[in-house]
């Protein structure tokens, strides 16, 4: 919830997601909390549909985000390359899970950093934020939305199963421009 709350505090307007563990908690939070004038939340049928939807939203000027896990992130490669080439701001959250291929959806692992830094063909290096605590998740959620807007391109936000499922009290966040 901290990551989602941070992104919302930064003005997130458009969230599209496919339910894939352990990223589903972000989709559920957004469905329950991202409401208001000009805001949109939708569950789609695939990760490819999700990346293309936020590409369109980013192209239209909306602060947009999706979340997935390792196998879904692999499917977003072409869309991330297009976002980089066309300078379309968007955020993709990769909630890492253990194992290769489809992986182990209920196990934790921190293994996607290299994939997130180089998600598409060509000489592309994406900015990646990797928070380590619940409090850092809040600020990383906000920073990722702001960086995508500032630098006009995709930003990857890494999390992992244990962090995504953890609940704890944090200091009241300081909100400013």
Task: Give, region by region, the residue ranges found by the protein language model.
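Conformationally flexible catalytic loops at phosphate/diphosphate-handling active centers
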Residues: 152-177
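A structural signal for short coil/turn segments at secondary-structure junctions
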Residues: 87, 151-152
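Short, charged low-complexity intrinsically disordered segments located at boundaries
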Residues: 60-62, 144, 171-177
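C-terminal structured domain segments across diverse proteins
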Residues: 103-106, 138, 169
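Thiamine diphosphate
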Residues: 1-126, 130-131
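Short, solvent-exposed polar/charged micro-motifs at secondary-structure junctions
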Residues: 52-53, 139, 166-168
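Short intrinsically disordered, low-complexity coil segments enriched in acidic
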Residues: 1-7, 149, 155, 177
């Amino acid at each position: 919830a901290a990551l989602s709350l941070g992104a919302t505090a930064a003005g997130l307007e458009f969230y599209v997601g496919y339910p894939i563990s352990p990223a589903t908690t972000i989709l559920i939070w957004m469905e329950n909390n991202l409401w208001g004038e000009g805001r949109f939340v939708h569950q789609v049928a695939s990760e490819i549909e999700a990346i293309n939807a936020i590409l369109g939203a980013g192209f239209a000027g909306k602060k947009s985000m999706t979340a997935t896990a390792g196998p879904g992130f692999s499917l977003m490669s072409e869309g991330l390359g297009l976002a980089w080439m066309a300078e379309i701001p968007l955020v993709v959250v990769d909630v890492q899970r253990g194992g290769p291929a489809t992986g182990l959806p209920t196990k934790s692992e921190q293994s996607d950093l290299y994939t997130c830094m180089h998600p598409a063909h060509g000489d592309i290096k994406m900015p990646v934020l990797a928070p380590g605590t619940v409090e850092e998740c809040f600020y990383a959620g906000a920073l990722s939305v702001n960086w995508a807007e500032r630098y006009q391109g995709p930003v990857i936000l890494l999390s992992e199963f244990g962090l995504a499922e953890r609940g704890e009290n944090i200091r009241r966040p300081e909100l400013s421009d």
